[in-house]
C-alpha cells in the first residue's frame, strides 16, 4: 500500500511536488557507529550491554556541568519517572500518544480524512494535553532561567500568543518584565509617562 492511500494531502506542509534529499548524516542512523566511536562509547558508558552499572559519573564532571540547564545525575526515563508529572507524556512512544485509526471497507474518503483530522485534534485535548501542566512547566522555565528569557528587552512571551488554557484567547494581561523579584514597567508605559510630563510642562 502506498503512502498516498492512507495519508491525506494536508500532511504535506512543504511543496509536495518538490524532491526531497535525505539529511546527511541521517539522525535516524547509529551515528556512533557511523563516526567510528564505538570503542570510546564503551569506555565511557554508564551501563553495560547487560544493563548492569558501568562507569559512574565522576564528581569532577558534575562540577563542570553545574551551570548547564537540563543536567541530570540520574537520567530521566519512563521507568524511574524522573520527568515529574509530565513523565507519562514525555516518555511515550509515538504510537502510544494517540488512538490509532483503522479504515473500514465501507468508509468513504471524506470519512477517512475526517477521522484522521480528529486524531490530530485529540493530541491537544485531554488526556493527551493538559493545558494547566503546560502553563506550570512554562512558568517554571521562566523562573528557573530568567536570564535566558530576559536578555532581549524587546522579547515578550505574550507576543508568542500561546493558548495555554485552550480557550483560543491569548493572554491580554499587561506585560511586565521581572527583575530581581520586582515588577518593572514596560518601555511603552515609560514612554507614556514621558508624554504626560511634557503635557504638564
Curated annotation (Swiss-Prot):
Keywords: Activator, Nucleus, Transcription, Transcription regulation. GO terms for cellular component: core mediator complex; mediator complex. InterPro entries: Mediator_Med19_fun. It is found in: Nucleus. One of its GO terms (molecular function) is transcription coactivator activity. It holds the Pfam family Rox3. Residues 166-201 are annotated as: Disordered. Its main location: nucleus. One of its GO terms (biological process) is positive regulation of transcription initiation by RNA polymerase II. Belongs to the Mediator complex subunit 19 family. Component of the Mediator complex. Component of the Mediator complex, a coactivator involved in the regulated transcription of nearly all RNA polymerase II-dependent genes. Mediator functions as a bridge to convey information from gene-specific regulatory proteins to the basal RNA polymerase II transcription machinery. Mediator is recruited to promoters by direct interactions with regulatory proteins and serves as a scaffold for the assembly of a functional preinitiation complex with RNA polymerase II and the general transcription factors. This is Mediator of RNA polymerase II transcription subunit 19. It comes from Candida glabrata (strain ATCC 2001 / BCRC 20586 / JCM 3761 / NBRC 0622 / NRRL Y-65 / CBS 138) (Yeast).
